[in-house]
């Protein structure tokens, strides 16, 4: 393990000056303003302009090695000091595209699971490596839960090259940051396929969380992998979680490249249901909780009118205030909202929230960004160019964008939501965000991961900053980074 205490200073003056210069050039017709340098035009409910400042929590420079391919993250108080820590996973895929099959290339078993322990301020973090290499080859996602009942959160990681691994928090002994966490690869998952998402939730209300995960069959599915079906499963533990015999798998169903299985009380009846997504079938599946303390979930199709979703990243909220949870997800370049029908079994109607074209909609998070008491949506895209250098891409290519959609209120499901762009760099993949007021200043910030952009991959937090004057909308953490680009 590597212990790296850091303190990140705030430095904004040079960026603001360069942004002003670029805006001035654009106004005279000599240059087109980039997204990040564009003066903010969005006013929050308090009358101030919304700007965004980027801060680094973890990256290759902090880690001391080539950290890359940053994907999933979760937050929880691992050491019970009253501050939320961050667990993140890093796939180490800068030399290949894990979404493209290649039978002649075998990815090396590389990757890192990192913890950033929170300090006294949001600029102070203590970073360690929790797992790496064959323990966590190409880790894609992570979940937290107290599986052994000691009051401390344990960690479960989904490794896209292989398996699910359980890492047990050492707990009250005071060695959380320095001790080797005991671990177990769940035996029924070893060398059985590929796991890309993982969640932990108490599905049967017995006080012990279960693990939910979909086995998508292969990290880089080939046509043969799409033709076969692999399971969506619940993994439950009875006894010591470090013993393989304590774990049992309950298969909910088999599908073509299933890539997600999320716990959510979709019918608001007080117990957790499961929403799964299949990439091969390009559809969503609902498993209803029987509510009797068993894991005998009932499968139902989710019929959708107006679009198709494979369900890799999903969010849930009652956006139209009808008392029913809706589903929000990405469909290519579009952000889509599926309205839950009044009657179970009827079709879910799709409403288009907005588009990032030519960029994709990949990661997303809901929160009241502008302070008007409704839910807005932050989104991030997935750059498709080179991963270790900017390369010959232009404004019409799929680049790495951050943007947010402002909830228009009562007409939310009848018209596109206003889009407010934050940054658009040649390289950046933004898989996961968590909304949180990091600096306790009363407005919403976001923690996220960034991939596809070595050596700038890692974990960051995006500070919402409000000012009376409309300066550049985005202030990056680094002076040197992937090139900021205009819109098409």
Range-by-range predicted roles:
Residues 1-12:
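N-terminal secretory signal peptides that target proteins for export/translocation
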Residues 3, 16, 31-33:
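Positively charged, low-complexity intrinsically disordered regions
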Residues 14-26:
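Bacterial N-terminal signal peptides
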Residues 31-488:
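Beta-propeller-forming repeat regions
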